[in-house]
From Swiss-Prot:
InterPro entries: Nudix_hydrolase (IPR020476), NUDIX_hydrolase-like_dom_sf (IPR015797), Nudix_hydrolase6-like (IPR003293), NUDIX_hydrolase_CS (IPR020084), NUDIX_hydrolase_dom (IPR000086), Pre-Nudix (IPR040618). CDD domains: NUDIX_ASFGF2_Nudt6. A motif (Nudix box) lies at residues 173-194. This is Nucleoside diphosphate-linked moiety X motif 6.
Amino acid sequence: MWWASRARWLFSALLDVGGVGLRARRRTASSGLEITGSCGGELQGELDRFGGISVHLSRHRTLHRLDAAAFRRLLQAAIQQWRAEGRIAAWLHIPILQSHFIAPAASLGFCFHHAEPHLSTLTLWLGEGPSRLPGYATHQVGVAGAVFDVSTRKVLVVQDRNKLKNMWKFPGGLSEPGEDIGDTAVREVFEETGVKSEFRSLLSIRQQHRSPGAFGMSDMYLICRLQPRSFTINFCQQECLKCEWMDLESLARTKHTTPITSRVARLLLYGHREGFDKIDLSMEELPAVYTGLFYKLYHRGLPERYKAEMGTD
């Protein structure tokens, strides 16, 4: 999703930090040129390339002496200075042990942007018109692995222990931050079943909004085709009620499964009979436009002559 990637990029850029001092510093992306600007009041921060300022309260060791009222006066003076300097936004990073500063910040117009285990981030739009700050992550990502043994035509399935209905499904779970899709599938399959596997392709993507399992946010559920590297089952009894190698046609026909599992089982049947190139979304790593970064691109197979004739992005 290009728009989600751009929002994450913009967010990280807004949080880009430089040195901390009595004067905040901004470093341009290309030349490394430093541009200085004063911080309001006694609160020190860093200017970003978009004209916003980030303030990390953990770096202000004298704040522990202030009560909520004194902090509010300090922050109010800083906001006035930032407006005078033409700043467009303020990002306030508050450690959990300084959460008593959240209420005074909120009274001055700050709103929650996101929270981490030991830190909350608040924002205040200082520019003209409605806020143009990017939102935080919009989706959680779950990945399952369809481990299919082509020699026996069997696929690895589990029944979750904590579900209301005992339906057969592919083992899987939530992706960790910075973890590739294929790596999530392989890891989750091993953690739940004890079976080792290798990523082959992406098979399907399901998007569901207002998902109860995602705290009411949107949920992306991806199913990967995996090739088994071991076959002995040693499943996690805390997570799984049952685990077995099931005949693929039986999984496609049974009523004791979810619609998405049944559909992917039929995809696997089609791929096994007609060729997996008919169903696979293969992965290729390509260089990003950002220096030193790479990304994974998933798509149907592209003949080499098209790559050669048209070039690559």
